[in-house]
């Protein structure tokens, strides 16, 4: 069993894995868990040990069925009325051409939406809604803005973009899980992202699968080309 296959099995068990994108991109490691298995404990670990922004990444097919746009598209549309939004357009991202950010949500049964319990509840209920195919109930169950940031994966996943969003959703797809993942960047104590060596040591200490973006991309594309 290779490293990607080990990661797939870990995701199926509801375990956290670590994914490093590449030296040429963000140079960051994300904690990753399959959203259908999310628990408040996962959120707590991400919040305390990773410290970045906890986001939930969705397959583009799911986004299309839910009607969820990219945030840049919302800004562009709204800029017709609010000129400042045109000035804020993110056309100078140093590591990519376009951000994967979409909307933020809370489940309507949450209180503030920010607690570990509330965020886990929102994410799990989103995965349940998608798994059950209840796309028309999205607006009934969730409100926006909220405390769970949604990321919209690019069409074709890693064939067209090699961000943590696409790589982790591709892993969930390979695992035959609901293709939604919850991810969080690992931050260091020096004001920067945690180094690759530090995140590798963290993985070893906590017995977590650690893999690179290159491993995921090659495995996914190889399977895609064969199929």
UniProtKB/Swiss-Prot annotation:
Share what the entry says about its subunit structure, partners included. Answer: Homodimer.
According to the record, mutating residue 165 to S results in: Reduces activity by 3-fold
- GO terms, biological process: riboflavin biosynthetic process
PANTHER family from the UniProt entry: 3,4-DIHYDROXY-2-BUTANONE 4-PHOSPHATE SYNTHASE, GTP CYCLOHYDROLASE II-RELATED
Organism phylogeny: Archaea, Methanobacteriati, Methanobacteriota, Methanomada group, Methanococci
Q: What is the effect of changing residue 30 to S?
A: Reduces activity 30-fold
Q: Where, by residue number, does Mg(2+) 2 bind?
A: 26, 164
Entries under Pfam families matching the protein: DHBP_synthase (PF00926)
Summarizing the function annotation, the protein's role is: Catalyzes the conversion of D-ribulose 5-phosphate to formate and 3,4-dihydroxy-2-butanone 4-phosphate.
Natural source organism: Methanocaldococcus jannaschii (strain ATCC 43067 / DSM 2661 / JAL-1 / JCM 10045 / NBRC 100440) (Methanococcus jannaschii)
Q: Which residues form a coiled coil?
A: none
* Positions bound to Mg(2+) 1: 26
The catalytic activity of this protein is classed by the Enzyme Commission as 4.1.99.12
* Cofactor(s) listed: Mg(2+); Mn(2+)
What outcome is documented for mutating residue 164 to N/S in this protein?
Answer: Loss of activity
Q: Which GO terms describe its molecular function?
A: 3,4-dihydroxy-2-butanone-4-phosphate synthase activity; magnesium ion binding; manganese ion binding
What name does UniProt use for this protein?
3,4-dihydroxy-2-butanone 4-phosphate synthase
**Reaction it catalyzes:** D-ribulose 5-phosphate = (2S)-2-hydroxy-3-oxobutyl phosphate + formate + H(+)
Q: Where does D-ribulose 5-phosphate bind?
A: 25-26, 30, 161-165
Could you tell me which pathway this protein works in? Cofactor biosynthesis; riboflavin biosynthesis; 2-hydroxy-3-oxobutyl phosphate from D-ribulose 5-phosphate: step 1/1
Tell me the SUPFAM superfamilies matching this sequence: YrdC/RibB
Task: Tell me what happens on changing residue 55 to G.
Answer: Reduces activity 70-fold. Increases Km for ribulose-5-phosphate 7-fold
**For this protein, what does the record note about how its cofactor is bound?**
Requires divalent metal ions, preferentially magnesium, for activity. Binds 2 divalent metal cations per subunit. Zinc and calcium, which are present in the crystals do not support the enzymatic reaction.
């Amino acid at each position: 069993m290779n490293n990607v296959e080990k990661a797939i099995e870990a995701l199926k068990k509801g375990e956290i894995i670590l994914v490093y994108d590449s030296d040429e991109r963000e140079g960051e490691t994300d904690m990753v868990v399959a959203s259908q298995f999310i628990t408040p404990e996962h959120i707590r670990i991400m919040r305390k040990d990773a410290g970045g922004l906890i986001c939930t990444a969705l397959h583009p097919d799911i986004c299309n069925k839910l009607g969820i746009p990219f945030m840049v598209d919302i800004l562009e549309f709204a800029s017709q009325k609010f000129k400042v939004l045109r000035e804020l357009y993110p056309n100078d991202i140093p590591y990519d051409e376009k951000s994967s950010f979409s909307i933020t949500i809370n489940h309507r049964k949450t209180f503030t939406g920010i607690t570990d319990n509330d965020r886990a509840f929102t994410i799990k209920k989103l995965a349940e809604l998608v798994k059950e195919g209840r796309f028309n109930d999205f607006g009934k169950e969730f409100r926006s803005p909220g405390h769970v940031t949604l990321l919209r994966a690019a069409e074709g996943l890693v064939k067209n973009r090699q961000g943590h969003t696409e790589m982790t959703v591709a892993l969930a797809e390979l695992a035959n899980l609901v293709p939604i993942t919850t991810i969080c960047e690992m931050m260091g104590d020096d004001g920067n992202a945690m180094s690759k060596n530090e995140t590798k040591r963290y993985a070893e200490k906590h017995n977590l699968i650690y893999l690179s973006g290159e491993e995921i991309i090659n495995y996914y594309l190889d399977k895609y080309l064969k199929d």
